[in-house]
Structure formats: C-alpha cells, structure tokens
C-alpha cells in the first residue's frame, strides 16, 4: 500500500483501531478517524499518537448527511491520496419490534446503511481516480440469518455485505479492492448499547476478542480478500452452517438468544 491517507469511520461502540495492525514500512500518513459524537474519538487519537501515528480526530454524527460530509472534508484537507478506508459504523437495537421506537430504527438505518453508501461514494470515486486503494466494510455474521429481537439490525448488515461484494466486482478494473468483514459477537459494548444486557448476548456471554477481529479484518483488507468471518473457529463454523440451515430455523434459534428475559 502506498504512503497516503487512511480513513476509519465508525460508531463509538465499534472496535477501536490498533496501530500495531499496520506494518511499520507501510504505515500511511494522516489518519482521519471518526467515532460519531462520542468523546472517545479523542482517546482513540491519543492511542494512535502514542504509537507514533498522525491522527486527525473528527467528531461527527455519521447518521446525518452533514456529518458524513464533515468526515470527507477532513480527508480532502490532508491533500494526500486516500490509501485505505475502513467503513465500520453501525449499531443495533434490541427488543421486540412492536416495542421499539420508529425514530430509533430509522436512525439505525441512516447509520448502518445510508452513511455507508454516502461515504463509499466519496471514497470510491477518489480511489478510482487515483487508480488504487483498499476498502474494508464491516457487516456482521447477522447478515447470514434473520435476527428477531434485532429485527432491523440484521437486514441492515445483509445490505452492507451485498453492497461490499457488489462494489468489489465493479472496482476491480480501477485497481481498488473491497473487503467485507463479518464479525460474530464481539467483546465490546455493542450489545449493552443496544439494550441487550438482559439477553443471552448480555454481560458474561462468551464473545470474540475485538483485537483478534480487528486484526483479521485488517489482514484480509491488505490481502485484498473478498470477505472474512471475524472471530474464533466456532464463529467461522457458524457461518458455514448458516449456508445450509432453513431461515425459519435460524430465526427461531436467534430469537431464543436475543429475546429479552423477564425481570425477576
């Protein structure tokens, strides 16, 4: 990967980047990093700086079109070609569809789907113009099954998966690779922020290491792979299993894990 700018756009509950994932001889220039409206963006920038990286923190609401443009303007201000982009923004909402708020779900779609398309439009045109680049788009293992009690989240991740794979085919002739990362349940605050602590995905549940998942995604992006399931061997087996199981069976099984438990 040539020396240039790298972009990481993520919601604040997603995996934090680790500079150690970038080989020293290939480390890019400035890294505009957005983690939504959270003050964790400053912590992320400090972590990168301690490792000798030049990070430009950008606080922006990626569920809003103006927020996406703010991030892209930060990329343009570097004055350097964009070498790599990680589109990692996303969140879930737990609970029965009858009980969840419509505004919350429309906001989820804006973040998980609309912002990815919006930012990808800017990123892909820029990279195609320069004739090279690498893109990592985060989907989820949830893209491979119906997700009752996360009824809007799963379909949003199915979209990003197919979007990434479609883009990959289009951009081949322009020297740009697109990789889709599909993590299983990961040890971040993702499920807590989705209001799912009173489910099988809550506190104490066995989950994949976010450091391992981040490294797997980075390596796959650098190798130009089409997609990778992020997580341990059991997670990867689940992805294979999902290809053959009936959708109704997968839906029922997910419901037993994601359905809120009665308060005792």
Where are these regions (language model features)?
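Conserved NAD(P)H cofactor-binding loop of Rossmann-fold oxidoreductase domains
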Residues: 88-93
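Substrate-binding pocket helix/loop in short-chain dehydrogenase/reductase
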Residues: 96-98, 104-109
């Amino acid at each position: 990967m040539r020396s240039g700018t790298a972009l990481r756009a993520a919601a604040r509950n997603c995996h934090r980047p680790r500079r150690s994932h970038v080989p020293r001889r290939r480390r890019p220039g400035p890294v505009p990093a957005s983690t939504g409206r959270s003050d964790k963006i400053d912590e992320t920038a400090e972590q990168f700086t301690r490792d000798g990286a030049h990070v430009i923190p950008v606080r922006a609401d990626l569920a809003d079109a103006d927020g996406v443009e703010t991030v892209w303007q930060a990329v343009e201000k570097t004055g350097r070609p964009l070498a790599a982009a990680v589109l990692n923004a996303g969140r879930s909402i737990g609970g029965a569809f009858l009980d969840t708020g419509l505004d919350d779900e429309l906001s989820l779609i804006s973040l998980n789907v609309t912002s990815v398309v919006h930012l990808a439009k800017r990123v892909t045109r820029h990279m195609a113009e320069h004739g090279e680049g690498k893109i990592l788009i985060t989907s989820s293992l949830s893209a491979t099954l119906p997700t009752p009690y996360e009824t809007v989240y799963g379909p949003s991740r199915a979209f990003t998966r197919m979007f990434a794979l479609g883009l990959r085919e289009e951009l081949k002739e322009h020297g740009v690779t697109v990789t889709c990362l599909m993590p299983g349940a990961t040890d971040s605050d993702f499920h807590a922020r989705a209001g799912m602590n009173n489910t099988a995905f809550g506190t104490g549940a066995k989950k994949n290491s976010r450091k391992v998942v981040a490294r797997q995604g980075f390596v796959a992006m650098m190798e130009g792979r089409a997609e990778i399931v992020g997580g341990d061997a059991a997670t990867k087996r689940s992805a294979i299993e999902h290809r053959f199981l009936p959708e109704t069976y997968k839906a029922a099984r997910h419901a037993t894990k994601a359905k809120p438990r009665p308060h005792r």
